[in-house]
């Protein structure tokens, strides 16, 4: 168990700097990467491409966004009430 946690910590990477979001408040960065991931996933699925190219966006939004936000957004997408354009 301890070795598994050490491996996770060793391989953990935070979101890199994004010049579109230079300020401390990273809410917009979180939102944009969430949208970008799902747009990428939708586009790659439509083209029959490999979805793994979208994993970078997923890693970034999972690093930046609170889990409760992501859960709420996923539920809203499933219900068709999500406010973003994907």
UniProtKB/Swiss-Prot annotation:
As given in the record, the signal peptide range reads none
Q: Does the keyword Mitochondrion apply?
A: yes
Q: How does it sit in the membrane?
A: Peripheral membrane protein
Q: Which InterPro entries match?
A: COX6B-like, CX6/COA6-like_sf, Cyt_c_oxidase_su6B
Q: Motif location (Cx9C motif)?
A: 30-40
List N-acetylalanine occurrences by residue. Answer: 2
Domain (CHCH) ranges:
27-73
Family annotation (Gene3D superfamilies): Cytochrome c oxidase, subunit VIb
GO CC, any one term = respiratory chain complex IV
Q: In which pathway does it act?
A: Energy metabolism; oxidative phosphorylation
> Which CDD domains does the entry mention?
Cyt_c_Oxidase_VIb
Q: Please state where this protein is localized.
A: Mitochondrion inner membrane
| Segments carrying motif Cx10C motif | 54-65
Print the keywords alphabetically. Acetylation, Disulfide bond, Membrane, Mitochondrion, Mitochondrion inner membrane
Name the Gene Ontology biological process terms: oxidative phosphorylation
Keyword presence, ATP-binding: no
Q: List the disulfide bonds.
A: 30-65, 40-54
Quaternary structure annotation from Swiss-Prot or TrEMBL: Component of the cytochrome c oxidase (complex IV, CIV), a multisubunit enzyme composed of 14 subunits. The complex is composed of a catalytic core of 3 subunits MT-CO1, MT-CO2 and MT-CO3, encoded in the mitochondrial DNA, and 11 supernumerary subunits COX4I, COX5A, COX5B, COX6A, COX6B, COX6C, COX7A, COX7B, COX7C, COX8 and NDUFA4, which are encoded in the nuclear genome.
Q: What does this protein do?
A: Component of the cytochrome c oxidase, the last enzyme in the mitochondrial electron transport chain which drives oxidative phosphorylation. The respiratory chain contains 3 multisubunit complexes succinate dehydrogenase (complex II, CII), ubiquinol-cytochrome c oxidoreductase (cytochrome b-c1 complex, complex III, CIII) and cytochrome c oxidase (complex IV, CIV), that cooperate to transfer electrons derived from NADH and succinate to molecular oxygen, creating an electrochemical gradient over the inner membrane that drives transmembrane transport and the ATP synthase.
Tell me its family: Belongs to the cytochrome c oxidase subunit 6B family.
Identification of the protein by name? Cytochrome c oxidase subunit 6B1
Q: What is the lineage of its organism?
A: Eukaryota, Metazoa, Chordata, Craniata, Vertebrata
Give the gene symbol: COX6B1
């Amino acid at each position: 168990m301890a070795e598994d946690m050490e491996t996770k910590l060793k391989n953990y990477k935070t979101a890199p700097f994004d010049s579109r979001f230079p300020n401390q408040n990273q809410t917009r960065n979180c939102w944009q990467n969430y949208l970008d991931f799902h747009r990428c996933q939708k586009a790659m699925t439509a083209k029959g491409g490999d979805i793994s190219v979208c994993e970078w966006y997923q890693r970034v939004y999972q690093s930046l966004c609170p889990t409760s936000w992501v859960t709420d957004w996923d539920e809203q997408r499933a219900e068709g009430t999500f406010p973003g354009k994907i």
